[in-house]
């Protein structure tokens, strides 16, 4: 993070110079335009009177040309000074970040096998669909000859259609979707449908007294949600008292906050993804975010390993030389460490539950077998190794 902070400081300096230069540029050009405008008015007045160009006006015109030239040269000179600041940002990036990252990953990651290429392409396509960049995703599918089923595309197409409508403050498609999936949303304890009805009611309130009767009529949609959202419904109904005076100057002015639209987009995305079995963030974006956290740590440990000449510590297999804390946001499943070998289990070495209930790794189980029998390391029970069952957390 220190490296990012160093680059950010240089970037802030450049942005401040750009801002100052822009303001100075604007002032200089406005003054120049005003000066030229005055001179033009004097010349027009002299032309109307039919008088020849006086020596004074000729001198003023020469001064005007010189002033324009000096101003342009000064602005160009100031602009050149900014170039050095921009180049310092590039130097700060080169100084604080190592561009050579191949040493922190296994060579197999860059293997050009067709299967791995398809997995990466599919991750990119899914990310593009989830971001609403449908045409780009289709173009990538055509160029990479990747076959994507319509069943895979359909949820993303529907999600993006509804989100586009919400961004345009059109609640119709979202309400229609929520009503058609009401039962499944209730199973998820989702309040999406209520929030959509509430936002529609607030839009009617924003219409003022002319929409009062329509708002009262629409309030009937709150009846199914009265038990769970009684307090919020009471607040909305109470706001009707201030409708003629203006909600923006009432205790209910918070109802008109524009942040409700951003909130409904987030709620819809989260609940719709849960209902459709999709992740809120694409696997590609999660992997990228995790990599941004892990890469600086891995670069540091790589430098330490090379400095101490103990390269055998990191053999580029399925585990890292140190644990990297990615935060709770990146926790998707539990992790089991074998209490015998003190190693984290993996797909090739999964956790095994013994008959007695104790859990060890498969590698530990194989090492404990003696004469075709297995004695639990934690209790006196002896058992057949084949009776062990794999556990999936």
Curated annotation (Swiss-Prot):
Q: Which GO terms describe its biological process?
A: proteasome-mediated ubiquitin-dependent protein catabolic process
Which UniProt keywords are present, listed alphabetically?
A: Acetylation, Cytoplasm, Metal-binding, Transferase, Ubl conjugation pathway, Zinc, Zinc-finger
Which of the residues bear the PTM N-acetylmethionine?
A: 1
RING-Gid-type ZnF? 338-379
Give me the reactions it catalyses. S-ubiquitinyl-[E2 ubiquitin-conjugating enzyme]-L-cysteine + [acceptor protein]-L-lysine = [E2 ubiquitin-conjugating enzyme]-L-cysteine + N(6)-ubiquitinyl-[acceptor protein]-L-lysine
Known SUPFAM superfamilies for this protein?
A: RING/U-box
Q: Which residues fall in a coiled-coil region?
A: none
Q: What is its EC number?
A: 2.3.2.27
Domain CTLH: start-end pairs: 155-212
GO CC terms: cytoplasm; cytosol; GID complex; nucleus
The record's annotation in InterPro entries points to:
CRA_dom (IPR013144), CTLH/CRA (IPR024964), CTLH_C (IPR006595), Fyv10_fam (IPR045098), LisH (IPR006594), RMD5B_dRING (IPR037681), ZF_RING_GID (IPR044063), Znf-RING_euk (IPR027370)
Q: Name one GO molecular function term.
A: ubiquitin protein ligase activity
Domain of life of the organism in this record? Answer: Eukaryota
Q: Where is the LisH domain?
A: 116-148
First-tier enzyme category under EC: transferase
Subunit-structure text: Identified in the CTLH complex that contains GID4, RANBP9 and/or RANBP10, MKLN1, MAEA, RMND5A (or alternatively its paralog RMND5B), GID8, ARMC8, WDR26 and YPEL5. Within this complex, MAEA, RMND5A (or alternatively its paralog RMND5B), GID8, WDR26, and RANBP9 and/or RANBP10 form the catalytic core, while GID4, MKLN1, ARMC8 and YPEL5 have ancillary roles.
- Please give the function described in this protein's UniProt entry: Core component of the CTLH E3 ubiquitin-protein ligase complex that selectively accepts ubiquitin from UBE2H and mediates ubiquitination and subsequent proteasomal degradation of the transcription factor HBP1. MAEA and RMND5A are both required for catalytic activity of the CTLH E3 ubiquitin-protein ligase complex. Catalytic activity of the complex is required for normal cell proliferation. The CTLH E3 ubiquitin-protein ligase complex is not required for the degradation of enzymes involved in gluconeogenesis, such as FBP1.
Write down what this protein is called: E3 ubiquitin-protein transferase RMND5B
């Amino acid at each position: 993070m220190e490296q990012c902070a160093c680059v950010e400081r240089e970037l802030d300096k450049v942005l401040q110079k750009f801002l100052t230069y822009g303001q100075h540029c604007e002032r200089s050009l406005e003054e120049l335009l005003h000066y030229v405008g005055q001179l033009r008015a004097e010349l027009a007045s002299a032309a109307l009177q039919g008088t020849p160009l006086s020596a004074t006006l000729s001198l003023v015109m020469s001064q005007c040309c010189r002033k324009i030239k000096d101003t342009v040269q000064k602005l160009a000179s100031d602009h050149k000074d900014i170039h050095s600041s921009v180049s310092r940002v590039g130097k700060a990036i080169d100084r604080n970040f190592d561009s050579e990252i191949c040493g922190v990953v296994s060579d197999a990651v860059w293997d050009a096998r067709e299967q791995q290429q398809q997995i990466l392409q599919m991750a990119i396509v899914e990310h593009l669909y989830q971001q609403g960049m449908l045409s780009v995703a289709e173009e990538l599918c055509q160029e990479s000859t990747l076959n994507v089923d319509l069943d895979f595309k359909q949820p993303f197409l529907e999600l993006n259609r509804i989100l586009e409508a919400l961004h345009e403050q059109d609640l119709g498609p979202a309400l229609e979707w929520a009503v058609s999936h009401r039962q499944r949303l209730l199973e998820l304890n989702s309040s999406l449908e209520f929030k959509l009805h509430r936002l529609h009611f607030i839009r009617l309130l924003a219409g003022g007294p002319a929409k009062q009767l329509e708002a009262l009529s629409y309030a009937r949609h709150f009846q199914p949600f009265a038990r769970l959202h009684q307090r919020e419904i009471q607040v909305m109904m109470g706001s009707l008292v201030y409708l003629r005076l203006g909600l923006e100057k009432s205790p209910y002015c918070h109802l008109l906050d524009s942040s409700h639209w951003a909130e409904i987009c987030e709620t819809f995305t989260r609940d719709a993804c849960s209902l459709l079995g999709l992740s809120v963030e694409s696997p590609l974006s999660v992997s990228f975010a995790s990599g941004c956290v892990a890469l600086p740590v891995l670069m540091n440990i790589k430098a330490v390993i090379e400095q101490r000449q103990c390269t055998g510590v990191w053999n580029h297999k399925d585990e890292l030389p140190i644990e990297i804390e990615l935060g709770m946001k990146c926790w998707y499943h539990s992790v089991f460490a074998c209490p015998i070998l003190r190693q984290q289990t993996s797909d090739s070495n999964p956790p095994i539950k013994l008959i007695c209930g104790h859990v060890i790794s498969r590698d530990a189980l194989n090492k404990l077998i003696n004469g075709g029998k297995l004695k639990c390391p934690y209790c006196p029970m002896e058992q057949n190794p084949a009776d062990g069952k794999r556990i999936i957390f």
